Amino acid sequence: MWVFGYGSLIWKVDFPYQEKMVGRIRGYSRRFWQGSTDHRGVPGKPGRVVTLVEDPEGCVWGVAYRLPAGQECEVKAYLDFREKGGYRTTTVVFYPKDSSIKPFDVLLYIGTRDNPNYLGPAPLQEIAEQIIDAVGPSGRNTEYLFELANSMRNLVPEDVDEHLFSLEETSKGTPGKRTKPKLPLE
C-alpha cells in the first residue's frame, strides 16, 4: 500500500515506510483551506493546513510512501489518527517524477468541504495572518507553512505552486501580530 503526502507528510515523516518516491497527482490543487484545532491551532483559534480541492487542470507534487509489508494496517491506523479532523481517504493515480516508473495507485487523505474544520477560501493576506498567529500542540503554524514550502523547493524545484509560495512570501512580509504566541501546556 502506498500513501501520498502533500502537506506535513512530506517533511514530518514519523511513521515507518519501505520506500518513498517524489511525484504528482492530477486533478487537484493544494490549498490552505483546512482548519487545524488539534495540531497547528486550538479550538477558537484554528491554524490553517493544506487540503486538496478538485481542479481539472491542477497538479500537486508530493511524496508517495510504500508502507512496510505486514505493517500496513498498523501504519494506516496511525495515519488515520494523525490526519483526523475532517479528512477522508480516496485512491488516486500517482505519477512518479522518474518517468521510467509507471504510474500507480496511492491512498490520499483529503479534508472535505463538509467537515467541521473546513475553513475554505479567504484573501491571501487573511490566511497569512491566521497562520502567523496560530500555534497548537504540534507547534507554530508558520513552521508548517515554511517547512512545506522549503521541502517543495528542494524536492521539485520546477514546481510552481502559486498558492503555497505566494502565501509563504506574504507570511514572511506580514508585520501584523508577530508576537510569539504561547505554546499550549503539555
UniProtKB/Swiss-Prot annotation:
Indicate which residues the UniProt annotation says bind substrate: V3, F4, G5, Y6, G7, S8
Which InterPro entries does the annotation name?
ChaC, GGCT-like, GGCT-like_sf
Q: Cite a single GO BP annotation.
A: glutathione catabolic process
Q: EC number(s) of the enzyme?
A: 4.3.2.7
List, alphabetically, the Pfam families matched. Answer: ChaC
Q: Does the keyword Nucleotide-binding apply?
A: no
Q: Where is the active site?
A: E83 (proton acceptor)
CDD domains linked to this entry: GGCT_like (cd06661)
Q: Gene3D superfamilies recorded for this chain?
A: Gamma-glutamyl cyclotransferase-like
Q: Can you state the subunit structure given in the record? A: Monomer.
Family according to the record: Belongs to the gamma-glutamylcyclotransferase family. ChaC subfamily.
Protein name stated in the entry: Putative glutathione-specific gamma-glutamylcyclotransferase 2
Q: Which gene encodes it?
A: chac2
